[in-house]
Each structure stands twice: as C-alpha cells, then as structure tokens.
C-alpha cells in the first residue's frame, strides 16, 4: 500500500536476514523490497536454489551476501544469530515453515524478545479500500487469557499508531 511505502521511504533501508528465499514468491518479494530501498538482504539458504531463483527472475544478487545453509532448521538458527548479534534488524520469512523459524527466534539464548509479549500482526489491504484490515494472533497466542489479550491489544494499537492510524477500531 502506498501509505506504508511513503512511511518506509522516510527511513533508511535495513539489513534483513532472508530465510530460504529460493522460491519465486519470496525472491520476488525481496526484489520488490530492495527496489523500494526498504532492505539490504542477506540471503540464507541453499546457495544453488537461491542463485537459480534469482536467475529465473533475471535479478543479479551478486552484490548481496549469501550464506549457504542447506538445512531448513539451520537457516533459522543463522537468522536468529545474525539478529541477536545486531548484524540484521529484521528477519524476512521466505520458504520456511513458520514453526521452524519461530522456534529459533523465540529461544532465550538469542535475546530477541522485548519486554512485551510477542504477538503476530497481519496487515492486509483490500483492493479499492483506503483502510487496512489488521488481524492479530491467528496462531501465535492460542486461547489467550484476559491478560494476554490486553498485551496483544496494546501491541496492535501501538503498531497501528506507528503506521499512521490514529484511532484504530478493535473488534
């Protein structure tokens, strides 16, 4: 959505660990993000698959770092380690099972959790609609109690404010 791109363009692109980008959709998404100067990728995964996928879309990724890691579980470990060491600011989920990635990211040894409860936010836009639909915690906080719901609500309201929604509607 243009409003999110406008907000993002006000900031410098960030280093991003791209986990298993060796499939068309993740690679195209990363290419779009690079073209918009949103991220500088570090590709993590099977080198041959990543290179072939980039070649298939006619994108020369030779100027970006590529860490050859053949096993899915190990790609998540490398991404979490890079984030923990401050070498990347974000982790981009490519073609990797969410539970595999989250299992690593949530490990205490990486110290990636902030002081608030972690929750999942899905920002969705609908054609010809100005307002986004933001859905939270489809799978991360299953059967939350009232206290957990309050944390989730705080996270999504804070997120909404950061993307320019002054008075988000919550249901």
Over which residues does each language-model region extend?
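Anion-binding alpha/beta catalytic cores of soluble intermediary-metabolism enzymes, centered on
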Residues: 1-171
């Amino acid at each position: 959505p243009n409003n999110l791109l406008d907000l993002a363009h006000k900031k410098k692109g960030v280093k991003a660990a791209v986990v298993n980008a060796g499939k068309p959709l993740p690679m195209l998404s990363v290419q779009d993000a690079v073209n918009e100067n949103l991220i500088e990728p570090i590709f993590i995964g099977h080198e041959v698959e990543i290179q072939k996928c980039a070649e298939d879309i006619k994108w020369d990724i030779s100027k970006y770092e590529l860490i050859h890691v053949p096993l899915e579980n190990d790609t998540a470990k490398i991404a979490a380690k890079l984030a923990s060491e401050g070498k990347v600011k974000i982790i981009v989920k490519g073609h990797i099972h969410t539970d595999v990635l989250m299992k690593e990211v949530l490990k205490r040894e990486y110290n990636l959790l902030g002081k608030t409860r972690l929750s999942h936010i899905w920002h969705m836009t609908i054609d010809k609609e100005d307002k986004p639909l933001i859905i939270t915690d489809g799978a991360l906080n299953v059967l939350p109690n009232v206290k957990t719901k309050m944390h989730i609500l705080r996270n999504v309201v804070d997120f909404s404010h950061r993307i320019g929604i002054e008075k988000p509607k919550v249901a």
